[in-house]
């Protein structure tokens, strides 16, 4: 399994607009081979930004990399450059190979 994240430093006062960009767009992810799940995460507020992270889980690094070369990726990111004033600098990518997964025990109902 592979986890891909991008960290964004969102300008104060732009949080709602940043979230709207993400929550209203078509991600084109649902039918991509190897895609498992996506989360948009809001982190701590700092003096000059609020930290956000996009977090996607893939069956493998190869599946993630194939998506980055796909038409679905181009469609999902075609307006990305127009949103730059919402955050500071460039998104910071981090990719992780999953070493261990621990899941909750099934609870009786």
Model segments located where?
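Short, surface-exposed ligand-recognition loops at beta-strand->loop->(often short) alpha-helix junctions
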Residues: 10-19
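Short, well-ordered beta-strand segments in beta-rich or mixed alpha/beta enzyme
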Residues: 2-9, 39-70
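An amphipathic, aromatic/His-enriched active-site/gating alpha helix that lines ligand/cofactor pockets
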Residues: 20, 24-36, 57-94
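Intrinsically disordered, low-complexity segments enriched in polar/charged residues with Gly/Pro
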Residues: 14-15, 26-31, 42-45
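Glycine-rich beta-strand-turn "strand-cap" elements at beta-sheet edges
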Residues: 2, 39-48, 78-109
